[in-house]
């Protein structure tokens, strides 16, 4: 088997995804005891892992540094990359939502100002609804934008809604459901087809058996 390099996101998705790889027989003990390391070799297979920021996973896969990647659908929607999206892993499920303070009126005809970390997704969503909005990109916590009057509402990923609730915001619209996706480098799918499809097929069977 030729070596397969897999890019994973650090943080929340990492905790959901590692058990899936273990369930298909890939040793992830180094990943679970990683310290500050970012590159790991599975002990019982020709598979290695790299841990990078979520926004960089698709870039590493697109450029062939990683053969396979696992990343949230939000990253793929916001950043168009020349990769294959192969499998919905069904973990890390969240929703894109429009949220604001209780006095926000989503039906107002006044041009709205929306704060978000996801300007591309937000622009497409409101364009499809036929609404002209001003979009302000925020890198940090967007929840504060409507509270301080920077924006009328926000577009953000909501998992439990606890952060919104703690800041006095409520969800006005649920836009899209998102989850972790397995992506593949286009060239690698040709040169390492058997190895990659072996992983994908085992993962798919594991997901189906768990439903």
From Swiss-Prot:
Q: Which InterPro entries match?
A: ATP_PRibTrfase_cat, ATP_PRibTrfase_CS, ATP_PRibTrfase_HisG, ATP_PRibTrfase_HisG_short
One of the record's GO molecular function terms:
ATP binding
Which Pfam families does the UniProt entry name for this protein? HisG
Q: Which reaction does it catalyse?
A: 1-(5-phospho-beta-D-ribosyl)-ATP + diphosphate = 5-phospho-alpha-D-ribose 1-diphosphate + ATP
RNA-binding: present as a keyword of the record?
A: no
Q: Say where the protein is mainly found.
A: cytoplasm
Major enzyme class: transferase
Q: Which UniProt keywords apply?
A: Amino-acid biosynthesis, ATP-binding, Cytoplasm, Glycosyltransferase, Histidine biosynthesis, Nucleotide-binding, Transferase
Q: Give the pathway annotation.
A: Amino-acid biosynthesis; L-histidine biosynthesis; L-histidine from 5-phospho-alpha-D-ribose 1-diphosphate: step 1/9
Q: Where does the record say this protein resides?
A: Cytoplasm
Instruction: State if Ribosomal protein is listed as a keyword.
Output: no
Q: Name one GO biological process term.
A: L-histidine biosynthetic process
The membrane spanning regions, by residue number, are none
Q: Which NCBIfam families match?
A: hisG
* Subunit relationships: Heteromultimer composed of HisG and HisZ subunits.
Which family does the record claim for this protein?
Belongs to the ATP phosphoribosyltransferase family. Short subfamily.
* Function description: Catalyzes the condensation of ATP and 5-phosphoribose 1-diphosphate to form N'-(5'-phosphoribosyl)-ATP (PR-ATP). Has a crucial role in the pathway because the rate of histidine biosynthesis seems to be controlled primarily by regulation of HisG enzymatic activity.
Q: Which PANTHER family match?
A: ATP PHOSPHORIBOSYLTRANSFERASE, ATP PHOSPHORIBOSYLTRANSFERASE ATP-PRTASE
Copy the domain comment.
Lacks the C-terminal regulatory region which is replaced by HisZ.
What is the name of this protein?
Answer: ATP phosphoribosyltransferase
């Amino acid at each position: 088997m030729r070596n397969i390099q897999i890019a994973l996101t650090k943080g929340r998705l990492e905790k959901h995804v590692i058990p899936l790889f273990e369930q298909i027989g890939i040793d992830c003990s180094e990943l679970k005891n990683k310290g500050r390391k970012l590159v790991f070799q599975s002990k019982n297979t020709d598979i290695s892992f790299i841990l990078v920021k979520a926004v960089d996973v698709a870039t590493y896969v697109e450029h062939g540094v990683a053969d396979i990647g696992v990343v949230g659908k939000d990253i793929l929607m916001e950043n168009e990359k020349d990769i294959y999206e192969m499998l919905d892993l069904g973990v890390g499920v969240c929703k894109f939502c429009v949220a604001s303070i209780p006095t926000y009126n989503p039906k107002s005809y006044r041009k709205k100002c929306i704060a978000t970390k996801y300007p591309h997704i937000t622009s497409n969503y409101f364009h499809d609804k036929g609404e002209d909005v001003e979009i302000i990109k925020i890198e940090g916590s967007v929840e504060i934008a409507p509270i301080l009057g920077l924006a009328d509402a926000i577009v953000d990923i909501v998992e439990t809604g606890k952060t919104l609730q703690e800041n006095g915001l409520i969800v006005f619209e649920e836009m899209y459901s998102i989850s972790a996706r397995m992506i593949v480098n286009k060239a690698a799918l040709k040169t390492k087809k058997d190895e990659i499809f072996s992983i994908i097929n085992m993962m798919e069977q594991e997901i189906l058996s768990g439903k």
